[in-house]
Every structure is written in structure tokens, then in C-alpha cells.
């Protein structure tokens, strides 16, 4: 929630179970209503991730405008606002969370831009990356996956439930981590049984007819 200090953001992260990535919903024009519904249903963290089929991100001014809408919703619901990839945009948007992929800006350099108050997350796709992110200086949480193949990451091979099991067994009591990739109501039980307490979802909520109900159903599965 924009306005929290680093301690408050990290305390909220520890409690977070359900993390949502969404595009700006430009064609639908319902970003504010969608965000309110998803957050009301139980989403703890909402990240703007809007890329074209070719992988190009939104122009900065459009990204900041969408983030402003999400920030207002986060304030209303006590949720955390996340920015994907861009440390400069995270700083400009006063985001709570910056999420970095393996090929993005190094954590040390990102920290120079966003400072120590912002939570920084890492994407991991195999055991070596997950083990590294679990101890990497400057990282607050990490994601493991994709558990299953997903159109939001075309061409990326699924890591499967084995990565979830490994992380739960060897890194389950350290910094927070989330399973990600193709997770929905049809398979979330498998992810939980493999040891995940927290998940990241996309289509399970963004494509739902009732985002509030979809979020609530997923949240119930996580306890």
C-alpha cells in the first residue's frame, strides 16, 4: 500500500498469500473496477505487467497512469502495489514492490534507484536460481516457476511441481516465496500439496467473469 514504510511493507509481505499480475485492461477500460473487485476478494499484492505479443512494455506515461489507478485501489484495500522490471517506474509510482526477472537489472543496481524501503522480488526457474534467490542480498521474496506452461511466458519450459517441492523442503522457512505459472482453481490444490503457501496468478482472475469471486475462491484454498 503506497505510503507504508519499509517495515510496514515487509510485514504485509509476510502475511501475503495471493499475488495477482494484470495488464492495464486498456481494451476493457475497467482497470479500477477490476482492481477493486480482485482486492476485495482477497488479493494481497497486485502487479502491473502489460506487454505486447512482441514483449514490448507500455510506454512509461501509460504505465504510470495505470499504476496510479492501481495505487488508489491498493490504498482502499490495504494491498501492496508491485511494478515489473522497471526500477525507475517503481520509484516514480511510489510502488511498494519491484519484481525483477533473471535478465533484468541486477538487484544491487536496482537498490541504488529504489532505496531500501521498497521490497524487491526475484523470478526463479530452476533449483539453482531458487536457492540463490533464497539468500541473495537485497532480495525480499522470490517466485518459482512456471509450474505449468502459460501463454504469459511463451517459450518458457515449465519447471513443474518438483521445483515447488524442492523450495518448500529446503527454503520453506526463510524469506517468502510464491509458486507461479498456470495456476488456477483446477490445479491449485496440487501446488498447495507440493508445499506452496503463496501463489501468483494471472488468468485465473483476469479472465474470470467475477474477479471478486475468483480471488476469494483461490484465497480460501490458501488458508
Swiss-Prot record:
It is an enzyme of class 2 (transferase). Pathway: Cofactor biosynthesis; thiamine diphosphate biosynthesis; thiamine phosphate from 4-amino-2-methyl-5-diphosphomethylpyrimidine and 4-methyl-5-(2-phosphoethyl)-thiazole: step 1/1. Keywords: Magnesium, Metal-binding, Thiamine biosynthesis, Transferase. Transmembrane segments: none annotated. Its cofactor is Mg(2+). 2-[(2R,5Z)-2-carboxy-4-methylthiazol-5(2H)-ylidene]ethyl phosphate binds at residues 150-152, 182. Its EC number is 2.5.1.3. 4-amino-2-methyl-5-(diphosphooxymethyl)pyrimidine binds at residues 47-51, 84, 123, 153. One of its GO terms (molecular function) is magnesium ion binding. It catalyses: 2-[(2R,5Z)-2-carboxy-4-methylthiazol-5(2H)-ylidene]ethyl phosphate + 4-amino-2-methyl-5-(diphosphooxymethyl)pyrimidine + 2 H(+) = thiamine phosphate + CO2 + diphosphate; 2-(2-carboxy-4-methylthiazol-5-yl)ethyl phosphate + 4-amino-2-methyl-5-(diphosphooxymethyl)pyrimidine + 2 H(+) = thiamine phosphate + CO2 + diphosphate; 4-methyl-5-(2-phosphooxyethyl)-thiazole + 4-amino-2-methyl-5-(diphosphooxymethyl)pyrimidine + H(+) = thiamine phosphate + diphosphate. GO terms for cellular component: cytoplasm. Mg(2+) binds at residues 85, 104. One of its GO terms (biological process) is thiamine diphosphate biosynthetic process. Binds 1 Mg(2+) ion per subunit. Condenses 4-methyl-5-(beta-hydroxyethyl)thiazole monophosphate (THZ-P) and 2-methyl-4-amino-5-hydroxymethyl pyrimidine pyrophosphate (HMP-PP) to form thiamine monophosphate (TMP). Belongs to the thiamine-phosphate synthase family. This is Thiamine-phosphate synthase. It comes from Saccharopolyspora erythraea (strain ATCC 11635 / DSM 40517 / JCM 4748 / NBRC 13426 / NCIMB 8594 / NRRL 2338).
Amino acid at each position: 500500500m503506497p505510503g507504508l514504510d519499509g517495515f510496514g511493507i515487509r510485514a504485509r509481505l509476510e502475511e501475503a498469500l495471493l499475488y495477482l499480475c494484470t495488464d492495464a485492461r486498456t481494451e476493457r477500460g475497467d482497470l479500477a473496477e477490476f482492481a477493486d473487485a480482485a482486492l476485495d476478494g482477497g488479493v494481497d499484492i497486485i502487479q502491473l505487467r502489460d506487454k505486447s505479443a512482441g514483449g514490448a512494455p507500455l510506454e512509461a506515461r501509460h504505465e504510470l497512469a495505470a499504476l496510479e489507478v492501481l495505487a488508489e485501489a491498493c490504498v482502499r484495500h490495504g494491498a501492496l502495489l508491485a511494478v515489473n522490471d522497471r526500477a525507475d517506474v517503481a520509484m516514480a509510482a511510489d510502488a511498494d514492490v519491484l519484481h525483477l526477472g533473471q535478465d533484468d537489472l541486477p538487484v544491487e543496481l536496482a537498490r541504488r534507484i529504489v532505496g531500501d524501503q521498497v521490497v524487491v522480488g526475484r523470478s526463479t526457474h530452476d533449483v539453482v536460481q531458487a536457492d540463490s534467490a533464497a539468500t541473495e542480498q537485497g532480495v525480499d521474496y522470490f517466485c518459482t516457476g512456471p509450474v505449468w506452461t502459460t501463454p504469459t511466458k511463451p517459450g518458457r519450459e515449465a519447471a513443474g511441481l518438483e521445483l515447488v517441492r524442492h523450495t518448500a523442503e529446503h527454503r520453506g522457512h526463510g524469506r517468502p516465496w510464491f509458486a507461479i505459472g498456470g495456476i488456477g482453481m483446477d490445479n491449485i490444490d496440487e501446488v498447495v500439496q507440493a508445499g506452496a503457501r503463496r501463489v501468483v496468478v494471472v488468468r485465473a482472475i483476469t479472465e474470470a467473469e467475477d474477479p471478486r469471486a475468483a480471488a476469494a475462491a483461490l484465497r480460501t484454498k490458501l488458508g
